[in-house]
């Protein structure tokens, strides 16, 4: 059974829209954990558009489950991670003009830099995950740079309509098996919703799903704890063929 990492970036988005002090993503963590979150995910972007450095420091002290820090593979972010010591770091691609992360890391192109960063973080007992597209060549290189985890990008699956979704699901299943054969542990995320999560949750070998936007959206209607509970129930007892789009 996959666990659930709740991404709270969108809570910070609301706060930063007015550059004020509320809503406070740090305070919302307790509600997410009460609802059953197995971990908390935040992305500290280079432009600080939502999560701020102060949030990170407070989250390190208040998260009772585990803290997953998403970040770009830069010297600044590596230094922050080494000082913070989150439970895991997920390296993601980042473009200032994008609304959200648009694709996976190109591990092949950035192999030397990624290997160096992974060595530095791993040397301080911080495991590293690489957010990648479900492509065999990328997975092979994830293993070669000594990543402990990969997070498979589910974005293409998430936007696919009925006729093509089985193919995307098959690719994710095959990629999970391939990653594990390379000794990698596997997470997945991006674009997952209450309507499309169950087939992904049913894939054998995926250990955690990182989900944010749909949970925060649902929380506006039912509250954060209930929104997390509803998502957790779908992940615990997934129906392999349930895709409601």
UniProtKB/Swiss-Prot annotation:
Question: What NCBIfam families has UniProt attached to this entry?
Answer: pdxJ (TIGR00559), PRK05265.1-3 (NF003625), PRK05265.1-5 (NF003627)
Any one GO CC term of this protein is: cytosol
Listed under catalytic activity are: 3-amino-2-oxopropyl phosphate + 1-deoxy-D-xylulose 5-phosphate = pyridoxine 5'-phosphate + phosphate + 2 H2O + H(+)
Q: What's an example GO BP annotation here?
A: pyridoxine biosynthetic process
Q: Which sites are catalytic?
A: 43 (proton acceptor), 70 (proton acceptor), 190 (proton donor)
Subcellular location field: Cytoplasm
- UniProt organism field: Prochlorococcus marinus (strain NATL2A)
Q: What is this protein called?
A: Pyridoxine 5'-phosphate synthase
Which InterPro entries does its entry note? Aldolase_TIM, PyrdxlP_synth_PdxJ, Pyridoxine-5'_phos_synth
Similarity comment: family membership: Belongs to the PNP synthase family.
Q: Read off the SUPFAM superfamilies from this record.
A: Pyridoxine 5'-phosphate synthase (SSF63892)
Pfam families tied to this protein: PdxJ (PF03740)
Q: Which residues bind 3-amino-2-oxopropyl phosphate?
A: 7, 18, 191, 212-213
Q: In which pathway does it act?
A: Cofactor biosynthesis; pyridoxine 5'-phosphate biosynthesis; pyridoxine 5'-phosphate from D-erythrose 4-phosphate: step 5/5
Which Gene3D superfamilies does UniProt cross-reference here?
Aldolase class I
E.C. numbers: 2.6.99.2
Q: Which UniProt keywords apply?
A: Cytoplasm, Pyridoxine biosynthesis, Transferase
EC primary class: transferase
Q: Any idea which GO molecular function terms this record carries? A: pyridoxine 5'-phosphate synthase activity
Function (record text): Catalyzes the complicated ring closure reaction between the two acyclic compounds 1-deoxy-D-xylulose-5-phosphate (DXP) and 3-amino-2-oxopropyl phosphate (1-amino-acetone-3-phosphate or AAP) to form pyridoxine 5'-phosphate (PNP) and inorganic phosphate.
């Amino acid at each position: 059974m996959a666990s659930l990492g709740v991404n709270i970036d969108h809570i910070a988005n609301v706060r930063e829209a007015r550059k004020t002090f509320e809503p406070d993503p740090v305070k919302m963590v307790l509600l997410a954990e009460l609802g059953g979150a197995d971990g908390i995910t935040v992305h500290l972007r280079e432009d600080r558009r939502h999560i701020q450095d102060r949030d990170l420091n407070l989250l390190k002290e208040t998260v009772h489950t585990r803290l997953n820090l998403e970040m770009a593979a830069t010297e600044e972010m590596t230094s922050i991670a080494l000082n913070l010591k989150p439970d895991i770091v997920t390296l993601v691609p980042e473009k200032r003009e994008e609304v959200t992360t648009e694709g996976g890391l190109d591990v092949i192109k950035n192999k030397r830099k990624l290997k160096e960063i992974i060595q530095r973080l791993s040397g301080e007992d911080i495991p590293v995950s690489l957010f990648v597209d479900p492509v065999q060549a990328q997975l092979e290189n994830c293993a070669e740079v000594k990543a402990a985890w990969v997070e498979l990008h589910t974005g293409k699956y998430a936007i696919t309509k009925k006729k093509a979704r089985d193919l995307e699901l098959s690719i994710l299943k095959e990629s999970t098996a391939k990653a594990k054969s390379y000794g990698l542990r596997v997470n997945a995320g991006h674009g997952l919703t209450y309507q499309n999560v169950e087939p992904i949750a049913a894939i054998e070998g995926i250990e955690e799903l990182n989900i944010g936007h749909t949970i925060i959206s649902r929380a506006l209607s039912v509250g954060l704890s209930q929104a997390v509970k509803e998502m957790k129930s779908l992940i615990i007892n997934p129906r392999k063929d349930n895709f409601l789009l």
